[in-house]
Amino acid sequence: MGLFDAVRRVFGRGDRAGTGAGDGASASDEDGGDWGLDAEAAAGDPQPGPRRRGGGHGRHWDTAVANDETLREVIATTLDDGQVRSSRVPDVDAVEYGTGALRCRVLRRDGDVVTAYPVAEGVAHESTVTEVTPWATDLEADATVVLGPEEFATYASSAWIAGGVPLGDGTVEIAALAYAPERTEESTYQTEDGGEFSTSGIAGFVPVDGGGVADYAFQSTVREIQRVPLFTANGYRFRVPLTRDGDGGEYETWLYAGAHAIDGRVPEAGDDVSGVFWVQTAVQ
């Protein structure tokens, strides 16, 4: 049994599977299910396909702010005090606000707000973009990338700059934002050949049934922890291996979590951590 198959067995199906995170719900929804997510909202977030799709960031904000009031404050402050960045798309710009590794980005067209989302500092990897699905706004997109042994869909946070994402090889900055991460105790499972598989120290992620395009159930091990400001509150980011290749080489990312989102004690270096995150990429 390979690592990816083993992670699927732990997270992907059956009574251990989580519910998904859609893009339509508000940050204050509390009917979260096993993973702190809203399956009903997820039903409104279609999987990527050949045509342009709708989308939004309602549930994505749950990783960074505790409630709708805080979200409104963050967006208002961004528009009042943020730095304006230009786009190569006519009549489009972005306003960004935030100190440190996590910022709010508000996209505007002709001065009108199109959307707002949290954007996080990630870890840069040499990667390949194999598929791009534009959103209906023409300023956002899902990008499928290859990282080590995995090929997976992400939210392309850089698409607004040029109105799309280039296919092919390049440098891709990857960050993950967790909805409800928690410290994870070791579990063991019987394999098909009669052996045992331990979850201790694994690093992997799988799509969440009913979740958004870039939502994944994950488990990993904390290598480093930093306390970071998350707008008006405190939060954390954890350096973790996102996946490993067959030779044991690790592909790391920064995993972000607001203090309000962490279930139980804050993980420390060396702890295994699990939950559901959404993945964003900036193609450089």
PLM features per residue range, with description:
Residues 77-215, 235-236:
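Long, hydrophobic alpha/beta structural blocks
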Residues 259-274:
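Short nucleic-acid-contacting surface segments enriched for D/E, G, S/T with interspersed K/R
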Residues 2-15, 29-113, 272:
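N-terminal ordered "arm"
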Residues 224-253:
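OB-fold (S1/OB) nucleic-acid-binding surfaces
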Residues 219-222:
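Conserved beta-strand residues within beta-sheet cores
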Residues 271-284:
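Short, charged beta-turn/beta-strand-edge "cap" motif at the junction between a beta-strand
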Residues 17-26:
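Intrinsically disordered, low-complexity regions enriched in glycine and serine
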